[in-house]
Amino acid sequence: MPFSSHPSPDPSPDPSPDPAPDDTRVALSVLATIDPVLRDSAVFGLVVGAPRVVALRHDIRAAEGALRRVVVDASGVVEDEVVPLEHACLSCAVREDAVPTLRRLADDGRWDHVVLALPVAAESLPVVRALAAQTTPGAELDRLRLATVLAVADVDTLEHDLLDDELVTERGVGLTEDDQRAVGEVLAAQLEHADLVVTTGDPVAAATGAGLVDRLRGVGTRRVDGLHALAAADLAGHTHDPVAGERRAHPLGVRGPLPRRARRAGDRSWTVELRSARPFDPERLLRRIEDLGTGRVRSRGVFHVANRPDSLCAWDGAGGQLCIGTLGTWDDATTAEGRPVEPHTRVVVVGATPPEGEPGDGVRERVLDAFRDVLATPDELADGGLRWLGRTDVLAPWLGARTDAV
């Protein structure tokens, strides 16, 4: 294994191959975090003492319509410029500056590993998706190969960061002036997509934070405790699998509960997997959606609704917010092995019980009760869905009109 990791409850091997010995392309690693101090500390640790490593750091200045580009290596700051953008957004930053700058750094010849440090609170998936397309043969970045996608998180604050309802704008790390994403939404997306999660803080004293990391990171990924354990050579010795990364981040690929033996002393984290072949009743779902999807939980998965049986619907909740929508049809969905996926409801809920001495919050019990209540009963389904014909579609504001839904 390229990573020396903390003992992990995940027994599965790292599915991504090491680069071929004769692969001379420049390694490209992508770093995401919600904390500017963690980002800068990680970048410093990666370039110090590694003269062949260079880091490209971006910060979006939405109010100015610009981004700040900083390039550093072991010798210090190589570049520090403010670059105007057509639109001050993440996709424009990648298209207008990251891609040409990465190509220039790869062509320079001084470095064989580039670390792209994303703007604080940026999600790695859309950036890596764009970079994967650009690193194919004949594309603009074909001199680079995707190495490691990593997320850096602090286990001491992770329970608060993930489960509370603070917004990124309230914390001062929003990508735009009106960024209404929850901190927990961003953090969860970073952890769920990463090949490697690097933690700071004490994983023993903050066992719940460490437990939440393990419940969210994908099967086959790694966790390393401490920035001191992070080495650029380890990152370069890995090859990111874009397909596996997309699958981890997809609502169909949500990680299920950990083995019971994996719990460490002091770990109050928990996972509840809500699964049924039956669809949700739309009216009851709307009535109890807050009980099922809001509060101090991270919930993610797929569901189907009795009055639109062909629609594959996504469920994504964190930081007190919940988003539902359609992903297409069940006929288009396949497993990682390419097999068809039958319509089903599967939502994985992750949370933490209150510390000892504090009153219980009853979240797990509330979620389980709401799930049982909103499922359509066998008697309701016996007529093939006729009972829902002609009724007002109460979920249309979120899922679209049934005539337009796929």
Language-model segments: residues:
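A structural signal for short secondary-structure junctions
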Residues: 22-24, 294-295, 307-308, 339-344
